[in-house]
Amino acid sequence: MAELTISSDEIRSAIANYTSSYSAEASREEVGVVISAADGIAQVSGLPSVMANELLEFPGGVIGVAQNLDTNSIGVVVLGNFESLKEGDEVKRTGEVLSIPVGEEFLGRVINPLGQPIDGMGPITAEEDRVLELQAPSVLQRQPVEEPMQTGIKAIDAMTPIGRGQRQLIIGDRKTGKTAVCIDTILNQKANWESGDKNKQVRCIYVAIGQKGSTIAGVRHTLEQHGALEYTTIVAAPASDAAGFKWLAPFSGAALGQHWMYQGNHVLIIYDDLTKQAEAYRAISLLLRRPPGREAYPGDVFYLHSRLLERAAKLSDDMGAGSMTALPIIETKANDVSAFIPTNVISITDGQVFLESDLFNQGVRPAINVGVSVSRVGGAAQTKGMKKVAGNLRLELAAYRDLQAFAAFASDLDPASKAQLERGERLVELLKQSESSPQPVEYQMVSIFLADQGIFDVVPVEDVRRFEKELHDHLNSATPQVFEQIQGGTALTDESKDALVAAAKDFTPSFRTTEGNNLGTEAPVDPLAADDVNKTELNVSRKTAK
């Protein structure tokens, strides 16, 4: 057995080599400590270099957003299970601000405000991340709103048109059909999506803030049922979520929309609704002990909504000519549009569609109050064809409403007023639409044009909607060239107008009313025909002679 010899020189050399190549691994990081945690807010001490809106990491992978940066503590909005936090827990900086993953893979999915899928359909592979609080496009990066965003709702497309890149407020009491108007707008984009034309396609984002889980599931089912989910993303912050998620949900949707907008695509985003976001932000601000203002809202609640809605824009050609159209929803109480949040958002947006509970209860659905609703920039985006046929529609309806109020007290009306009342009743009936039944712009134009020509005047009010449907079916087969000519909202030519009127007059006598009668071909008798006027004058002269 060989003897083991140990050389002191070898040992010395090995130690020298190891120590010369050794470098001590030292790390330095700021660590804070939780002072208190309650109601979704954590007070943290330490972390002197933390930034506003920086993400902080708590034990268990819980994250929070730094909001209040005081001298001795930080107020953090916890995004996740704050009940697991306790006093003394370590808090670490991440050096990052809040961002979400974005990309085409999000179409057809339901995600939370952090970009995580919650629909049980597996993980999402994102293209990139985008910061939530992204700066809105500057003035030079924008161009005027000139392209129409068709909603498929006659009352909106005809009288309060919306353009791509516009912010149009949908406002009204609860249960007046605000969400239904927005969902119908999403459904109306299906034909554009199936065309495959990038300039026509519209990607849709529905942001549900503080809604019941069953309501969000119902919206998803409606979109899936009508084949609209494939071009729609749902960002959900249900009522059961913490206030922090409801506050951030609209910004998550806007970040996703801006990603597509800057790629040159067209986006429609719906915030349902910003009243609940404002209430969540108020709760957060009060818990952070920020000074309250009017209705206990913090002083920067206007800035909360303005910086969000300014992100909707029509980009210049140099920026890719993409657009993001925003339809924010605001819920009023007792039709009071002069409250704090409604007046704020009205002043920020480019117009509003006001839904009235009284009209809704009368069966006028969508329950749009034409007199109060307005679109400040959409007129330039309205199609030429619709602008021509619907030019007098708003005035006719306004005159009808005034006359209707007067007729309630007047015992006798002159024939002209009676005729105006009867036409107004039929126009109101014509503008009614069933939920989830958007109408292409060509059919809207034909209906409004023929109503202006008096075709509907002989139809009983209760049969107007059925008459319209059957008339469209007849015109489709009798005058297909007209629908081709006005495709996309092109103005009606004189030949098309004559063809429509002739075909409509041919169809009218064959229509069977609810009572089982066919509509007569004879024009209604003027109650003040020449003979009647002479008889009236004769009777007056006899009375005068006596």
Swiss-Prot record:
Chemical reaction(s) catalysed: ATP + H2O + 4 H(+)(in) = ADP + phosphate + 5 H(+)(out)
UniProt site positions, description: Required for activity: S373
Source superkingdom: Bacteria
Spans annotated as Disordered: 511-546
Amino acids binding ATP: G172, D173, R174, K175, T176, G177, K178, T179
Bilayer topology annotation: Peripheral membrane protein
Keywords of the record: ATP synthesis, ATP-binding, Cell membrane, CF(1), Hydrogen ion transport, Ion transport, Membrane, Nucleotide-binding, Translocase, Transport
EC number assigned by the record: 7.1.2.2
Subcellular locations according to the entry: Cell membrane
Recorded family membership: Belongs to the ATPase alpha/beta chains family.
Quaternary state and interactors: F-type ATPases have 2 components, CF(1) - the catalytic core - and CF(0) - the membrane proton channel. CF(1) has five subunits: alpha(3), beta(3), gamma(1), delta(1), epsilon(1). CF(0) has three main subunits: a(1), b(2) and c(9-12). The alpha and beta chains form an alternating ring which encloses part of the gamma chain. CF(1) is attached to CF(0) by a central stalk formed by the gamma and epsilon chains, while a peripheral stalk is formed by the delta and b chains.
UniProt-recorded name of the protein: ATP synthase subunit alpha
Organism name: Corynebacterium aurimucosum (strain ATCC 700975 / DSM 44827 / CIP 107346 / CN-1) (Corynebacterium nigricans)
Gene: atpA
